[in-house]
Swiss-Prot record:
Keywords: Chromosomal rearrangement. This is Increased recombination centers protein 6. One of its GO terms (molecular function) is protein-macromolecule adaptor activity. Belongs to the IRC6 family. The keyword NADP does not apply. GO terms for biological process: vesicle-mediated transport. It comes from Clavispora lusitaniae (strain ATCC 42720). It comes from the Eukaryota.
């Protein structure tokens, strides 16, 4: 079975197709069923200066039918996960290298989100040997109040996942990429099992990885002395970095964490 697979999972109208179309550039809609998006696959080729990689975006939707009422979505997700963790799905699980869980943030319920994140945590434990990345991606059909978005992001972070709001783009106050730009960055910086180096030496590729990692944390503690971040801001940033570290391979974590510690100590 092909490797380099990303599972894109979520309920109806939560952005699964929008994510897949953005990453793949495939906006054809004739093959998309009105009843369910499960089973769709988008193929894409990601290219950077140093490598290219073929990636499959595997779409799964719960419940099985869009006619099911929303109050049954949690039980439908539990049923889906029960099938996913079964022996018959072992071959598929072995080739999953990333999971994008999609949610609609127009009207979200703390209790529902928590139950979904609990199931996602079980999935993370199930796939831990693959060392996949996990992203919770939110979409909205209208503007969301900043406080509401911050509450949702905090809830996701406290459960050990990174939250990305699809409608965003550009960079935040920490100079971290946001929204679509962050989603693309996650895929471009992941250590894919099968990739093709673009006529560069391994040393150049390792230098590229180091440069990418540095740029992802640029601005963490680079403010002028007159504009030192507050403790709340630093704690929020620490939560974001914790989520990033959890997605790294074991041999990458120590150096990255050591660098973070040194930078944080400059403030104390």
């Amino acid at each position: 079975m092909d490797r380099n697979n990303v599972l894109v999972l979520g309920p109806p109208k939560s952005g699964k197709i929008r994510f897949a179309q953005f990453i793949s550039g495939d906006y054809e809609t004739e093959t998309i069923s009105d009843d369910s998006h499960s089973g769709l696959m988008y193929k894409c080729n990601l290219k950077t200066k140093y490598f290219s990689v073929d990636v499959n975006l595997l779409i799964e939707e719960f419940p099985e039918s869009r006619k099911e009422p929303e109050e049954k979505w949690i039980s439908s997700l539990q049923t889906w996960f029960g099938e996913f963790e079964s022996d018959t799905m072992a071959d598929l699980r072995e080739v999953i290298e990333g999971v994008v869980f999609t949610v609609c943030v127009n009207e979200w319920d703390d209790n529902v989100i928590k139950q979904q994140l609990d199931i996602l945590s079980n999935m993370k434990d199930l796939l831990k040997d693959n060392d996949p990345f996990f992203i919770v991606m939110g979409v909205s059909e209208h503007d969301i109040e900043q406080d509401t978005m911050a509450d949702l992001e905090d809830l996701v972070l406290l459960n050990g996942f990174e939250f990305v709001y699809f409608n965003d783009s550009g960079m935040n106050e920490f100079r971290d990429k946001m929204g679509k730009d962050r989603l693309l960055e996650v895929l471009e910086t992941h250590e894919w099992t099968q990739k093709h180096l673009t006529h560069v030496s391994n040393e150049d590729y390792m230098a590229y990885k180091k440069e990418k990692m540095t740029s992802m944390t640029q601005g963490l503690l680079q403010e002028d002395d007159c504009n030192i971040p507050t403790l709340d801001v630093l704690l929020q940033k620490l939560q974001i970095e914790k989520s990033k570290v959890e997605e790294m391979k074991e041999n990458e974590r120590k150096g990255y964490v050591d660098g973070l510690v040194d930078e944080f100590l400059e403030y104390f």
